[in-house]
């Protein structure tokens, strides 16, 4: 397959003139370095992947999750190159897929889903909040690598980060839930955010999509079937090839590695695994799982670290090697959109079983939900205080940004950006400083 990609996909929004001696790196190697060395990436080490699980240091953080997703992502690309050599020229380089997987979570706020719900509610009249939208905003404008363009990443890298390539105003439910009388009454399910890009970041989105023909741009922003109720959010249909690989790597890291955490930390029992996962995997339609599930179950709950690790590695490998590139069922002209990576349907069923098991027995349990609820309340408290008197309470540099943004009536977005960037511990510390009688700074 002959591929001749437009050199515009290597372009950066700000044409840089860096003083770099003998710099022979590719654009994507430079992108990877910028992400790795960014403050936003470092903060992931203090944002927990699953909250309230343990006080020990075994459990995963957002940072270790991102590193594992990156390793799986490069593994997916390597095996597709072997299996489908005709796509070699189109597939992302290791540096590019690494960049996407490392950056995919940097927009996540403190306290995970609880923090996301809180910020979305507090920003309900100011454009909303959503983790993926915040990731795009960080890399295109907030991270101080350049003055106005964030990390100033390559255009293809930014395209790969667009999991939901539409504005939030296009995906948000037509009828929002009513505001609550008091924040303690807020129900998380009512304020789960729509997926997309902030309307205030339209210029950055337009720049990323500039090389596409008009029909490709329109098609990329197309929605799935209309929701059954005007109270439901709309969902985008399409994404780039690079993004589809990153998303599969993220799903595998979540479904398999978070399962490992849950087993080691004693959050799930063998009986729960047998009933809610193993039984379904034995009937998922994939011959590998059907043949090996009994042995895998023994290994996962053997109590021996190296045996469990071998089982985890086997599951990751089985999922990873069942991924291939196929044409997208839509008439895209650009090759980056015309093809996506897909997992074989039966293996896809197995991955859904694993993800559902993690959600049911790890994420949705009261122990974790109480922690997220606490974080949700804490973030709303912070937002309420900072937005009530920003000039008094915001740090000096953030206060300057707020004053400038307020001229365009966008001060709330600056406060939201400030809170979203916090680590769990920093948010808790600031809350104590503002609200605890015992706090001495």
Curated annotation (Swiss-Prot):
InterPro entries per the record?
dGTPase (IPR006261), dGTPase-like (IPR050135), dNTPase_2 (IPR023023), HD/PDEase_dom (IPR003607), HD_domain (IPR006674), PHydrolase_assoc_dom (IPR026875)
HD domain mapped to chain residues: 62-255
Instruction: Provide one Gene Ontology biological process annotation.
Output: dGTP catabolic process
The superkingdom of the source organism is Bacteria
Q: Molecular function (GO) terms listed? A: dGTPase activity
Answer whether the UniProt record assigns the keyword Hydrolase to this protein: yes
Q: Which family does it belong to?
A: Belongs to the dGTPase family. Type 2 subfamily.
For this entry, the protein name equals: Deoxyguanosinetriphosphate triphosphohydrolase-like protein 1
Species per Swiss-Prot/TrEMBL record: Vibrio cholerae serotype O1 (strain ATCC 39315 / El Tor Inaba N16961)
């Amino acid at each position: 397959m002959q591929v001749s990609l437009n050199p515009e996909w290597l372009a950066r929004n700000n044409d840089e003139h860096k003083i770099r001696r003998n710099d022979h790196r590719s654009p994507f190697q430079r992108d990877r370095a910028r992400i790795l060395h960014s403050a936003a990436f470092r903060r992931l080490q203090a944002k927990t992947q699953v909250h309230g699980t343990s006080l020990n240091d075994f459990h995963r953080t957002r940072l270790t999750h991102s590193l594992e997703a990156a390793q799986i992502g490069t593994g997916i690309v390597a095996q597709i190159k072997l299996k489908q050599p005709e796509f070699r020229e189109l597939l992302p380089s290791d540096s590019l897929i690494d960049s996407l997987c490392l950056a995919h979570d940097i927009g996540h706020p403190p306290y995970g889903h609880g923090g996301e719900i809180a910020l979305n509610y507090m920003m309900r009249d100011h454009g909303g909040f959503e983790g993926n939208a915040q990731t795009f905003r960080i890399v295109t404008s907030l991270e101080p690598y350049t003055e106005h363009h964030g990390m100033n990443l390559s255009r293809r890298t930014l395209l790969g980060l667009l999991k939901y390539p539409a504005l939030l105003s296009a995906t948000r439910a037509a009828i929002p839930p009513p505001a609550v009388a008091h924040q303690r009454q807020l129900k998380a399910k009512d304020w789960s955010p729509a997926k997309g890009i902030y309307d205030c970041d339209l210029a950055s989105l337009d720049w990323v999509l500039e090389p596409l023909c008009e029909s490709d741009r329109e098609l990329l922003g197309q929605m799935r079937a209309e929701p059954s109720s005007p109270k439901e959010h709309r969902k985008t249909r399409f994404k780039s090839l690079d993004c589809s690989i990153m998303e599969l790597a993220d799903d595998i890291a979540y479904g398999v590695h978070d399962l490992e955490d849950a087993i080691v930390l004693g959050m799930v029992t063998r009986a729960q695994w047998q009933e809610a996962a193993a039984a379904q995997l034995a009937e998922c339609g994939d011959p590998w799982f059907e043949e090996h599930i009994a042995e895998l179950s023994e290994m996962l709950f053997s109590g021996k670290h190296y045996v469990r690790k071998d089982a985890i590695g086997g599951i990751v490998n089985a999922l990873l090697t069942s991924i291939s590139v196929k044409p997208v069922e839509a008439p895209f002209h650009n090759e980056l959109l015309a093809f996506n990576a897909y997992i074989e349907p039966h293996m896809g069923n197995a991955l859904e079983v694993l993800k559902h098991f993690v959600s049911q027995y790890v994420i949705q349990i009261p122990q974790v939900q109480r922690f997220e609820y606490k974080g949700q309340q804490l973030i709303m408290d912070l937002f309420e205080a900072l937005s009530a008197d920003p000039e008094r309470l915001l740090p000096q540099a953030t206060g300057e940004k707020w004053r400038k943004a307020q001229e365009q009536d966008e001060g709330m977005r600056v406060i939201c950006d400030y809170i979203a960037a916090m680590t769990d511990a920093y948010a808790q510390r600031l809350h104590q400083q503002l609200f605890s009688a015992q706090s001495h700074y």
